Amino acid sequence: MEVFGDNKMFYMRDTWREGTMICDVLPINPSSNGVWPQQKFSDPNINVHFWNYAFPHLQMIFLIISFLWQFLHFFLRRLGMIRFTSHMLTGVLLSKSFLKENSAARRFFSTEDYKEIVFSLTAACSYMMFWFLMGVKMDTGLIRTTGRKAITIGLSSVLLSTLVCSVIFFGNLRDVGTKNSDHTLNSLEYVVIYSIQCLSSFPVVGNLLFELRLQNSELGRLAISSAVISDFSTSILASVLIFMKELKDEQTRLGSVFIGDVIAGNRPLMRAGIVVLFVCIAIYVFRPLMFYIIKQTPSGRPVKAIYLSTIIVMVSGSAILANWCKQSIFMGPFILGLAVPHGPPLGSAIIQKYESAIFGTFLPFFIASSSTEIDISALFGWEGLNGIILIMVTSFVVKFIFTTVPALFYGMPMEDCFALSLIMSFKGIFELGAYALAYQRGSVRPETFTVACLYITLNSAIIPPILRYLYDPSRMYAGYEKRNMQHLKPNSELRILSCIYRTDDISPMINLLEAICPSRESPVATYVLHLMELVGQANPIFISHKLQTRRTEETSYSNNVLVSFEKFRKDFYGSVFVSTYTALSMPDTMHGDICMLALNNTTSLILLPFHQTWSADGSALISNNNMIRNLNKSVLDVAPCSVGVFVYRSSSGRKNISSGRKTINGTVPNLSSYNICMIFLGGKDDREAVTLATRMARDPRINITIVRLITTDEKARENTVWDKMLDDELLRDVKSNTLVDIFYSEKAIEDAAETSSLLRSMVSDFDMFIVGRGNGRTSVFTEGLEEWSEFKELGIIGDLLTSQDFNCQASVLVIQQQQLMI
């Protein structure tokens, strides 16, 4: 039946597909003429509304899916679940299980008409771009630097697990049923299930660690390295198996395989050769082309849009080529993604341009559209259900064991081994895509696909909350020994971790390190860590410039830091030892890099720049970086040693401790003294601050004044008897120390108002203040002031000194003594 419109431009026709009438519109017009329906035919029942067109329909589905998964995630994240679980549940809600056949909602989300082409193409492009972006984020250098532990765990968790499952499968095949019928699983389905169950994909593991904020932890780095090894080994194995299967089918078709048929018939050997040629082109042509684009991009300028568009066209072509070569559609884009240099400027430009749209909109659409074939009602009475559950549980247990055993062999704690096994057993978008591809090609039946999707949903819902409970990243930063300045042996080496966030932090940090008075008798070993935000790659990078473990182009990230601290080392040759590092990671996990480096090098002090910077005269606020503030607070919470937060103010009227001299032994007769005041209220943080001030007093050009606040309040004294005894003992040693010249005074204070007045009267007399943080410690000197504090990380006294009301132009160093110990 054909119905022509008045303009003769299109018609509607009825076609039959398996007994179902499908109305099609020719020629296909993907976009409508507007929201309001227009009368085109005499019969109003055949009018075409705007939602009957492909693109408006697709946009409405995007909107519904985005709303649903974000609504679900709003509640599920409070249970410790990640976004992928919300994506899967959205797909389940829109599947056959909940949308009944022939209902209006089912017809709206159905693709059984001309819109199927648009929907399928959109889902395929989403999956293709996801793998390309994961390739861009992935650091291929991680493979070269992977240790034996990660290689052993990666190979064992995948290859050995698959081998053992194969033995179990063939050995117990008769017990679980092997007849090829509509009611039981066939052998191909078993192979597909346990093969996918034994995999560990880098994108899946990386996304899980990112959402749990574990990628910077020791466990996270090990899991990422193991997943990379697993990915590459399984990719090579899968390519070989696909090639062998194609070759076997070709041999069956021809009776033999020879060169003539290969060349003339476009068969498996030719496809394999094209795949190898494509990899070589990606390495030796595409990657140099990417470096050419980087070279053509001026420093600080964005990458030209034409370059990015050309890359995306090449990615689409690689997906088509991979599909033609009988490989997975993501193989080509993933290889091209690996060939793109990660990080700025090109890698980060690609990520910034496409990541939000792909991960926020298109990827949920792919997951939801892949899950629409889930039909829970088909499982009732299905005889193969027990068999598929058995093989899934068996595969999980085998993989869990073969991940745990190698980890135990390398001496990892039992809890960490279990956590690592759960991470490697996590299932995500890769497994969903693999099952969807198998279902599309007829390798698994609808019931098997339904169970597999439900298992992935259950797996993603259970494992993340267990990991949050089982593994605490802060626990690994706790030490067995006291790592602070107060308990260091006299004249022993002081190890300091100096953090650099901005180039403006370099000079103040060097100035502070000089004030600590390094000498040959009591040297200072400083570990300089330049922290940069991770953009354009998935796995964090940690560069040791001393070992030169990274490529030369990556060391340019920290060139200013390297040059400045190398000069500092030469100026204090024999008294200062410098090791410089660069860490590229997400802001939420940067504290892991800081704490791990401090733990590995047994430092006694971590120096952190304050998140605010001021003008040259110290009066005007220039920048206020909340990301740095959150990072500092995270370090204060989990640091394995003492921590100092340095609030630097450079005033033209103030003196610079390093001005006029190049070495610690050199003296300048006309050099003005540098006045430092230590405000002592009592407690372990203040005792740590006194220890640092005493060390600074060894420099004859630094005048140290210790002002102790005392009170006659008996109640306050009774509540801190033990602390007061330790305070008195330390201060007695300081006053009796004849090697340093320290001015000591005591001020009687009755309440917080007098404390504030005293500090206000002192701010113009000193160049720097040193105070203890005193976190959680109540004192009559500060009672009532805490509720007015703006920066809790500075403590009450430190916050007062940095507040605008005080008009203090002196620098402030806030000290917190080591808190975490096992």
From Swiss-Prot:
Superkingdom, natural source: Eukaryota
Topology relative to the membrane: Multi-pass membrane protein
TM spans (from-to): 55-75, 116-136, 150-170, 190-210, 224-244, 274-294, 305-325, 331-351, 362-382, 388-408, 418-438, 447-467
GO molecular function list: antiporter activity
Record localization: Membrane
Major localization listed first in the record, in broad terms: membrane
InterPro entries: Cation/H_exchanger_TM, CPA2_transporter, Na+/solute_symporter_sf
Cellular component, GO annotation: membrane
One Gene Ontology term from the biological process aspect of the record: potassium ion transport
UniProtKB keywords: Antiport, Ion transport, Membrane, Potassium, Potassium transport, Transmembrane, Transmembrane helix, Transport
Function: May operate as a cation/H(+) antiporter.
UniProt similarity note: Belongs to the monovalent cation:proton antiporter 2 (CPA2) transporter (TC 2.A.37) family. CHX (TC 2.A.37.4) subfamily.
Name of protein: Cation/H(+) antiporter 3
Organism: Arabidopsis thaliana (Mouse-ear cress)
Gene: CHX3
